[in-house]
């Protein structure tokens, strides 16, 4: 009884690229932000601090552009890019959530109803972060 596994990508390349750009930019923003914040303790010179702030802002722009592209793709992208597949306030979500509560072991192609809530929370947090640049 040999079963052959087939690799199937649920998310298109654009979504996977969006995720990896977020991983890289958010990680860099945190590390550079901490270095800037602890500059005196770490012995960072004024010139180095200015350079780090410039790099930090540039990476912030990359993060913002990536997020804006994803927000737009939610309206004009392929089927799994669309907000109707990703966010929790679309038609049929309440039924999907009720079904999930009754049978949480159900397999979903994409996000389950709780995952959709998390996606919404992350998109809101990232949009606030992009708009303020302070978080």
Locate predicted features.
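Membrane-embedded alpha-helical bundles that constitute the cytochrome b-like, heme-associated redox core
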Residues: 1-135
């Amino acid at each position: 009884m040999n079963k052959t596994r087939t690799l199937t990508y649920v998310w298109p390349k654009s979504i996977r690229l969006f995720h990896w750009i977020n991983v890289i930019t958010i990680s860099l923003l945190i590390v550079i932000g901490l270095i800037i914040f602890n500059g005196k303790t770490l012995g960072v010179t004024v010139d180095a601090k200015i350079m780090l702030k410039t790099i930090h802002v540039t990476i912030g722009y990359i993060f913002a552009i990536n997020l804006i592209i994803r927000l737009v793709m939610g309206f004009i992208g392929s089927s799994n890019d669309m907000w109707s597949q990703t966010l929790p306030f679309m038609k049929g979500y309440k039924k999907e959530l009720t079904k999930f509560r009754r049978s949480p072991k159900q397999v979903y192609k994409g996000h389950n109803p709780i995952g959709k809530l998390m996606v919404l929370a992350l998109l809101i947090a990232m949009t606030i972060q992009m708009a303020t640049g302070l978080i």
